[in-house]
Amino acid sequence: DFRLELTWLRDHPQKYDLGECEFHLALSVPDMDKAHALHEKLGCICYENPAMGIYFISDPDGYWIEIVPER
């Protein structure tokens, strides 16, 4: 099972640019330590925020994907 959350930017003033990195996909994982270890091994972690308990990985095209703990 998974849940995909989409955001509708109704009043966004210009055409959506996938390269903005301001808007991104977020995935929740049941085991943050296990996911972090895997992503660290793959070398795809591009930003970490330990205070918030999240981190970001970069896909092959350079787009960021947020990894958050399952709640």
Annotate each PLM feature.
Residues 1-26, 36-58, 70-71:
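Vicinal oxygen chelate
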